[in-house]
């Protein structure tokens, strides 16, 4: 079940909010946990034992850590992290590792039967759990004594599909604040966030994404038949689709959280206005970047142990970033691609970029869009070699004229909505309550029309 489905919007969400608001005090966490379990099990219960076992194990780990003498505490986080990573590696990476070993050494290892679909949200909730373990071990938070609160944090359904990866230390105070859980200002913000996120997903992402799908799908024109201009148009469309899909879901997630009384930090901050790759990664998937910074880069020494060590730390972080996104070599290459760009910027390029903002912006967009070409290279119909050939070796083929005529409005709208203009405009609309209400109602009706007519309700980042 996804946020932009008819079932979620018109059945699950209204009933979930009604039950949540009716139950007072600590009972809200119980209701939240039950709703999260129902949400998790909607597509099947085969992975329910996995997440229940992980919740029980990590809850007991926290209690044990709180009672263990200092001399033994160093062993406990290592064991806990290994257990959690083992679950992630088994379901997400085991067959990729087996296939890689077979290619390297012809070992003839058989693939494991881990299911065709990943356990829902495993990449996100494992990282949430590890952040809890790290913060408990370092004393940033106390171990959670309430099993309901801990389980509600791990299973929190607004963040289960595509995050954001909210740290426990940011959620814990809110999980235990029952009196002020629901207030009018936060609920109003929640409605706005959810509505804007839904619009980004169903109006922009899905409409723009149809262009890229038509280019690479077997039922479409096929990448091998397109011209160089159409290849560029297609990868730009994919770049916009990915942004509006992921940013839209992140806003819907934060909107749902706000409706339930939780104030969560934004996961995106207009990344396509960036004037460097460094700035781009401060604005894109902020919760993931922050997680790698806090739990890998800084513990490894960050930039405190000399230039060579810093380069090694950056290499490990960006290799891990690529691997986190999927069990495929293109994701690893994509992560290392950004490592190289960031090293170049850090060592000399940034000072030149600051002198010419327009050139810096064009440079950033070019390499980000090119990076998405590497990112999407595991999709059937979009092999990296063919895509790069189409992009950089001028050649004829199907013209982009038809696609500009059919998708041009959405592409222009996508570019405009990637800028600061919508934020500036909404600030002015919000000054007049009546105008704000009318605009919100019209946008909601438009979103509903798109939701009802939609044939595809998937979330791109749910696959990671």
Model-derived features: where do they sit?
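Membrane-embedded transmembrane alpha-helical bundles that form the catalytic cores
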Residues: 1-463
């Amino acid at each position: 079940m996804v946020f932009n489905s008819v079932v979620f919007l018109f059945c699950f969400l209204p009933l979930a909010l009604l039950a949540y608001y009716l139950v007072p005090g600590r009972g809200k966490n119980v209701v939240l946990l039950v709703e999260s379990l129902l949400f998790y099990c909607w597509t099947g219960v085969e992975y329910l034992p996995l997440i229940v076992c992980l919740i029980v194990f990590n809850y007991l780990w926290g209690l044990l850590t709180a009672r263990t003498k200092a001399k033994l505490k160093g062993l406990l986080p290592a064991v806990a992290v290994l257990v959690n990573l083992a679950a992630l590696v088994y379901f997400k990476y085991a067959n990729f590792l087996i296939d890689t070993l077979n290619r390297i050494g012809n070992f003839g290892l058989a693939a494991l039967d881990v299911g065709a679909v990943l356990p829902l949200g495993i990449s996100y909730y494992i990282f949430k759990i590890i952040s809890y373990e790290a913060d408990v071990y370092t004393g940033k938070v106390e171990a959670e004594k309430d099993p309901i609160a801990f389980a509600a944090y791990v299973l929190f359904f607004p963040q289960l599909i595509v995050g954001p990866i909210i740290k426990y230390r940011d959620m814990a105070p809110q999980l235990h604040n029952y009196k002020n859980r629901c207030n009018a200002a936060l609920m109003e913000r929640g409605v706005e966030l959810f509505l804007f996120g839904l619009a980004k997903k169903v109006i922009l992402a899905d409409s723009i994404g149809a262009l890229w799908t038509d280019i690479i799908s077997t039922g479409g024109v096929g990448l091998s038949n397109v011209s160089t201009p159409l290849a560029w148009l297609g990868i730009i469309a994919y770049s916009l689709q990915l942004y509006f899909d992921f940013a839209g879901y992140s806003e819907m997630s934060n909107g749902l959280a706000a409706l339930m009384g939780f104030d969560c930090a934004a996961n995106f901050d207009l990344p396509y206005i960036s004037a460097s790759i460094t700035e781009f990664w401060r604005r894109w998937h902020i919760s993931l970047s922050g997680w790698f910074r806090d739990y890998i880069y800084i513990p490894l020494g960050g930039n405190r142990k000399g230039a060579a060590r810093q380069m090694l730390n950056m290499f490990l972080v960006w290799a891990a970033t690529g691997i986190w996104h999927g069990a495929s070599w293109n994701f690893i290459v994509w992560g290392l691609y950004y490592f190289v760009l960031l090293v170049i910027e850090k060592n000399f390029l940034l000072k030149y970029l600051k002198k010419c903002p327009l050139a810096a912006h064009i440079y950033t967009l070019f390499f980000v869009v090119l990076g998405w070409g590497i990112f999407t290279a595991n999709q059937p119909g979009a092999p990296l070699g063919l895509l790069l050939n189409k992009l950089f070796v001028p050649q004829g083929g199907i013209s982009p004229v038809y696609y500009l005529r059919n998708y041009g409005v959405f592409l222009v709208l996508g570019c405009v909505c990637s800028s600061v203009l919508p934020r500036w405009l909404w600030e002015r609309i919000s000054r007049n309550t009546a105008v704000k209400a009318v605009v919100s109602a019209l946008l909601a009706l438009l979103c509903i029309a798109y939701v009802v007519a939609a044939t595809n309700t998937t979330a791109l980042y749910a696959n990671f």
